[in-house]
Amino acid sequence: MNLKVIEKLTSEKFWRAKSKLNRTKIQRIFDNYSKKIDKSSFSTSFLNGKFVSVNFYVRDEVLDSYVELKFRFSPLNPRESLNFSTEVDSLPEIRILYKEITYRSYETYNKALKKDINNTIKELKSRLAQLEEML
């Protein structure tokens, strides 16, 4: 799993640099980034007719889990009906779903991920010690 790409996609700086975003441009951005990460996919939709919604999924084979990044883009003009060319706010609401827990920032997600990695390492070391005893 490429954490640098996930960090970039969830950074405010990355999205602030984008201008004149609409669903078509958003799809292009996520299409490019899904090509950079193995085992990833995404879907876009008009959520309740009020938001452009993107769900970006990344499979982590090492930890045998999924990370889901959820993005909601609000239209610049809330009265305008959404279509593929409706301009949206470049700063989305972002949520990261990992092991059934929702994180609102990359930093809190990364802490949970590191804790999970450390626990996996401890478990593997314990198994290795048990296997060595069997020799």
Q: PLM ranges: what are they?
A:
Residues M1-L9:
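N-terminal, Lys/Arg- and Ser/Thr-rich interaction peptides
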Residues N2-L3, K39, E61, E133:
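Residue-level signal for functionally critical sites in structured catalytic/ligand-binding pockets
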